[in-house]
């Protein structure tokens, strides 16, 4: 299928779930095709999460979603090792980020330590747990949503994390 027809088909599928945000949908698709991670910022209840899930379905990507809150731990994102008594050894239990599309919902509600757990996966395409690196599946994409800074329970994302996102700001999400 020709590139423009494929893009139109993907956008058509996403529009079945997200209505009235054509400019934002086009920007998100361009960011995905460019291989970038995406940050969607807007007030609660305008469809940021629905949009991210619609893209994962339209692109047939295996996705995981974490609703970030202050009690989410870095190991929820990266995974952890656990002793397997039957096997007599430690075994890696994959975290939520080991998927094709990771939806980091309300990322700016998590602690800085948990937010930082995403950095290695976003920058290097792997997570390291107990000194062992585990590659993330390819393609790999993070779509993060956040509420505006200053909203109750939110904090600013560090510059080192912001640098890894293509930001689609709140003005364009409000159409």
Where do the protein language model's features map onto the residues?
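Loop/turn-to-beta-strand initiation segments
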Residues: 36-38, 62, 98-102, 124-127, ...
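P-loop (Walker A) phosphate-binding loop of NTP-binding proteins
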Residues: 43, 77, 145
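Conserved alpha-helical scaffold flanking the Walker A/P-loop in AAA+ ATPase domains
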Residues: 27-30, 83-103
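Pre-Walker A (pre-P-loop) alpha-helix and adjacent loop at the N terminus of AAA/AAA+ ATPase modules
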Residues: 2-46
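Walker B catalytic acidic pair
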Residues: 42, 105-106, 117
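Walker A/P-loop
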Residues: 32-70
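Canonical AAA+ ATPase core
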Residues: 84-89, 110-114, 122-174
């Amino acid at each position: 299928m020709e590139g423009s027809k494929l893009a139109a088909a993907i956008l058509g599928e996403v529009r079945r779930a997200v209505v009235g945000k054509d400019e934002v949908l086009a920007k998100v698709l361009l960011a995905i095709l460019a291989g970038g991670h995406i940050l969607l910022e807007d007030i609660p209840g305008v469809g940021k999460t629905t949009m991210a899930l619609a893209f994962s379905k339209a692109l047939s990507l295996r996705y995981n979603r974490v609703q970030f809150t202050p009690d989410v731990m870095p190991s929820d994102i990266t995974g952890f090792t656990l002793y397997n008594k039957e096997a007599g050894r430690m075994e890696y239990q994959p975290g939520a980020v080991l998927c094709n599309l990771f939806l980091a919902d309300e990322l700016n509600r998590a602690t800085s330590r948990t937010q930082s757990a995403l950095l290695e996966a976003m920058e290097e395409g792997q997570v390291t747990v107990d000194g062992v690196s585990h590659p993330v599946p390819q393609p790999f994409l993070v779509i993060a949503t956040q509420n505006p800074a200053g909203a109750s329970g939110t904090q600013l994302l560090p510059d080192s994390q912001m640098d890894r996102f293509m930001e689609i700001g709140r003005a364009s999400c409000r159409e």
